Amino acid sequence: MKTQYPKLQTIELEKGFIELLEGNIILLKFKEDGVFELRDAIEANKAIYSAVKGKPFLSLVDARVYGSISAGAREFFAKDTLTKEIKIAEAIVINTLPARLYAKFYIRLSKSANPVKIFSDIHDAKLWLQLQQKSMFGEVLERDIRFHDKFKNN
């Protein structure tokens, strides 16, 4: 499966970056050592919606580099309907225990109708997102099902 996605568009935010990648993937990356507040989450969601032009997308959150995220921002990301309704699936990439705890809390808070999964490897996260998109649109092949076994547990 192809895991390299060229950047189609990059939007710089005050405390992060939104990258539109091929394959309907939106990558949210945080800038180092900042506190991602509610206003930053609102700005990010508006930028995401604008980048995808209101069409379904796959969300890839790279939380390997970040300062912290406020409770208001976490709750906003979990419950805001602007992008939640068009998000096919979401993969969160982490590399620290605090980030894993934040991600697990976010998953419980969001009660998403769409799949959300935590990863430590960004390539695995992209492959999983690709599989979720194929599942949604009925394009899953037998080799994809074997591949899916790798991701049954977090």
PLM region spans:
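Amphipathic, Lys/Arg-enriched alpha-helical "gate/interface" segment within cytosolic domains
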Residues: 1-154
